[in-house]
Amino acid sequence: MPGGRRGPSRQQLSRSALPSLQTLVGGTCGNGTGLRNRNGSAIGLSAPPITALITPEPVRHCHIPELPLDGGLLFEFLFFIYLLVALFIQYINIYKSVWWYPYNHPASCTSLNFHLIDYHLAAFITVMLARRLVWALISEASQVGTSSMVHYAALITARLVLLTLCGWVFCWTLVNLFRNHSVLNLLFLGYPFGVYVPLCCFHQDSRSQPLPTDCGYLVQDPLVDDGANGMATLVRPRDFLSLLRESLREQFNSTPSIPSHSCPLSPDLIRNEVECLKADFNRRIKEVLFNSLFSAYYVAFLPLCFVKSTQYYDMRWSCEHLIMVWINAFVMLSTQLLPPKYCDLLHRSASHLGKWQKLEHGSYSNAPQHIWSENTVWPQGVLVRHSRSLYKAVGPYNVAVPSEVSHARFYFLFHRPLRLLNLLLIIEGSLVLYQLYSLLRAEKWNHTLSIALILFCNYYVLFKLLRDRIVLGRAYSYPISSYGLKPH
């Protein structure tokens, strides 16, 4: 009506009905930053930190059962037996004879051409393959308590006799090999060590960032403590002899102890724990790769280098045997050095670390954004800016550095606890299936014998992987709330 009371206009009604931005999101929501309007400028609002507004979901861990793991001495013995079987198979593939020919044929008396085999080379390879077993025996004998001086003297004498015997056989085989072979062939004897040491030196000296030194809460014994304290000095240049001594000591060391996880609450402690675990995992993977390649080299490749030019052998089958030995040795060493308890430790640390997803510029322009702070625990779904980029929190508990690629890689590998176990199971299962297929199509007696012997060893490894996968799959699928655990 013309003379009546006018109500509020549409524009005034819309403005009064909508709450303010500060009421919706609580102001800046953390770390002295503000929201952004449509023009991109920041609105300076004072508000409590984001952890006071949104509580991050607490990290809960599953309890996994204690799965049996082979002891260090037992594993080294089984691994040595497997390598000897693989070496015997390679010699069969190279020096087999046609023993079913008539007896007047020159190569019909035995199944192998024993007169062509270099026994000095076979003894040298055996000594090189037994290095870990010998050191495991010495380490186990050193840890046994001595009740009397007689017992202690007997242990010292046994260690000296064992080391003297191995050293004498090693020197005796080297002298005979130097007499009977050319220099080019002799270079293949120490090729793995000649390649490993420069690569190890380059890897250690090329580190640009020192590892954290406050990793004492991760270790359980002095052996691991010494290794953790020494990791901080990797960036300092050292002479070649010290690197060589350290590299050789790593090759003779037994299985390292598994670190512990203390569920730290401070973001700095979580990142330091991740750095220490990352260095420990890289050291274990380096040991797995080198020892598997070392074993395959001396078992399947080195005998081929000393075959006479007039000797015929199946090159394709010998190379296939080389690949099978390397894959199975890799899986065996991985199951020993990366047991389920250790993988669960990495999974727990990755759950505390979290992950950030990088977003495109212009996306989420109207959503609240914050400046990333290293002292803040960020909940899931929060948008932060770091190094001129926009990131979104993926994990329920995020303390990782958004621009740190190693943190994202660590979370990707270990946030699923069964990822490594599934990978090893797929590799070993594929190898066993291929060997069964090759066994069905085998027509030569040496092919059938070699596949059957290797399969007998692979079945044991496959059984352990399947057992761990079934048990851990049930354990991780069990509801965490039923444990009655307190969140960390």
Curated annotation (Swiss-Prot):
InterPro entries attached here? Uncharacterised_TMEM39 (IPR019397)
Record's superkingdom? Answer: Eukaryota
- Glycosylation positions in this chain: 31, 39, 180
Membrane topology, as annotated: Multi-pass membrane protein
* GO biological process per UniProt: autophagy; negative regulation of autophagosome assembly; negative regulation of autophagosome maturation
Which Gene Ontology terms of cellular component type are present?
Answer: endoplasmic reticulum membrane
Q: Does the keyword ATP-binding apply?
A: no
For this protein, the parts annotated as crossing the membrane are 72-92, 110-130, 155-175, 182-202, 287-307, 319-339, 420-440, 446-466
The record's similarity note reads:
Belongs to the TMEM39 family.
According to UniProt, the name of this protein is Transmembrane protein 39A
Query: From what organism does this protein derive?
Result: Xenopus tropicalis
Show the taxonomic lineage.
Eukaryota, Metazoa, Chordata, Craniata, Vertebrata
Its encoding gene is what? tmem39a
